[in-house]
Amino acid sequence: MARPDGIDAVFAACDAMALGALDAFAASDLMVPRDIGVMGFDDLLAGRFSRPPLTSIGPDPAEAGAALVEAVLGADAEKRRRVPVSLVARASTARM
């Protein structure tokens, strides 16, 4: 598979999808991150051990857990809560 023109990177909705993209690109002889970057969301443990290790956006576990408990217990069900996230930069992306 040739890299589509103008596409430098893929941002997947979750790390599981990003890991699938890593596999697909490897099977297509595209080198990550030389030919295309890959990034996921949720910072799964598996991303640390993929080849190359997956760059991800990771939510703060304590804040995410607290938000989940509040939602399950029905505490102010109409309230939206933002959970802080951070970039976990690994080798699946390169600086442009």
Spell out what each predicted region is.
Residues 2-96:
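Flexible loop/turn connectors
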